[in-house]
């Protein structure tokens, strides 16, 4: 059997863009014949998938699945909204989230478990696909809400199903960062306080007066970034805390995921640039 050298692995990586372990495996199976390895990788879609891996995947879907008091929220990305609605893509996402909620696996474990399936899907669809993140929420009472494919929310707490569902809808729309005003970390409060003091002083207020003014502003700030402090979207004259009290309900935790959060999308290519790229070949 021919020896698979580091130089061969390096060359195959450069020619296909695939990962080191994938290249080594392909060379072993091809008895160190690099041309055969490339041919086999092309057939399996591995080479194509590797080339697509550099493409920004900022579209996709948030999938939610509940099982035995645990809900999994999964983000799977693709490159276009069209593929996000493709049945092959959605079937893949459903398969991954089912495995996630059954085992509460980390995203790294899910990525490893479904890598071969992902590579095959990339080859079939022609876009980069990425299992980006997964989060779990546990509780005796869970309510979930999806706004299209793009936003997913799960709320854990106590109360009737309708109330918790409405709270989940509120979270989707209002993007709170914490459950209660008291949950806002001290460093976040101090940072915002410093900003507000500076704003007040820039308005011509002496520092002592500025700091007193900021006390009211900070109460408003912690209310705006926390669920229970926000005005309820369905009854804006009441806070979420007041609604929960009226309904005899409470919220202990929530997770809100939105497709593409934090992903920098590539600038869209103009028609002229597209033509130039085609001419370059």
From Swiss-Prot:
Keywords: Cytoplasm, Elongation factor, Protein biosynthesis. Residues 80-83 are annotated as: Involved in Mg(2+) ion dislocation from EF-Tu. Gene3D superfamilies: 1.10.286.20, DNA helicase RuvA subunit, C-terminal domain, Elongation factor Ts, dimerisation domain. It comes from the Bacteria. It is found in: Cytoplasm. InterPro entries: EF-Ts_dimer_sf, Transl_elong_EFTs/EF1B, Transl_elong_EFTs/EF1B_dimer, Transl_elong_Ts_CS, UBA-like_sf. The keyword Transferase does not apply. GO terms for molecular function: translation elongation factor activity. GO terms for cellular component: cytoplasm. PROSITE patterns: EF_TS_1, EF_TS_2. Belongs to the EF-Ts family. Associates with the EF-Tu.GDP complex and induces the exchange of GDP to GTP. It remains bound to the aminoacyl-tRNA.EF-Tu.GTP complex up to the GTP hydrolysis stage on the ribosome. This is Elongation factor Ts. It comes from Aliivibrio fischeri (strain ATCC 700601 / ES114). The lineage of its organism: Bacteria, Pseudomonadati, Pseudomonadota, Gammaproteobacteria, Vibrionales. The gene is tsf.
